[in-house]
């Protein structure tokens, strides 16, 4: 059985989280946290993520929290996976 340290690595996976209007913070944190934990258990960076939205600089969650975006929909970025939140 493979362990975290023995899994064959194919490079850092680039994950984009597309934040919809009124997204829920619990969904976002539930999606990011396993990636963060995997990185902390590994000797290398397995995942890198960014936040994407339609707004200019921030997206507002369903409970009114403003989240700073890393990119907007018009930015050209290379990702391996996009998760819609």
For the regions a language model picked out, list residue spans one by one.
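Extended, subdomain-level signal for the structured scaffold at the beginning of enzyme domains
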Residues: 1-85
């Amino acid at each position: 059985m493979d362990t975290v340290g023995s899994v064959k690595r194919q490079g850092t996976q680039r994950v984009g989280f597309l934040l919809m209007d009124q997204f829920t913070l619990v969904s976002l944190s539930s999606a990011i946290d396993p990636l963060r934990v995997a990185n902390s258990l590994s000797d290398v960076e397995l995942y890198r993520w960014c936040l994407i939205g339609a707004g200019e600089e921030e997206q507002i969650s369903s409970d009114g929290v403003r989240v700073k975006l890393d990119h907007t929909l018009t930015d050209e970025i290379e990702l391996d996976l996009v998760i819609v939140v």
